[in-house]
């Protein structure tokens, strides 16, 4: 932002559109040691450092905060019921998705805050986010549960951020053909309600 603010075209720039990964904040799963450690720390906070409660919720007698492992790609590909995970069978997956999506939301909010601070709050900041309506995407033919890879499970956090001014999303990819129709993927009323 500082570089652009000092450029001859600075007065032509009204804002910044944050893009991560493909531009839509989708990524490949992070199986690094810091990701493993971050997940364990997040779980410790969520469950109040109570390993017995975690064992009960995950239905795992042998787990400790030190031996927690991230769900494999194959585990993330298969939901319990269509695109849904149930706490009774998949609390471990649910916890991981909440953690992973929270990290993504925190990241975009941190970037947005940095831009706002760097520009003296004079520039707009937006991003792709909020894809909660994906009609036709889960029809059994997808190679994985597509809902797990949309960094929008923490959409409320993004909506409530004072550093993000607008949110955008392409219309559904499923009906992009001759004779197709426009299907929005984001909850427009919620976005408007939050002043975005």
Model-predicted segments: where are they?
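Aromatic- and carboxylate-lined catalytic core of secreted/periplasmic carbohydrate-active enzymes
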Residues: 196
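Polysaccharide-binding and catalytic clefts of secreted carbohydrate-active enzymes
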Residues: 1-164, 170-173, 181
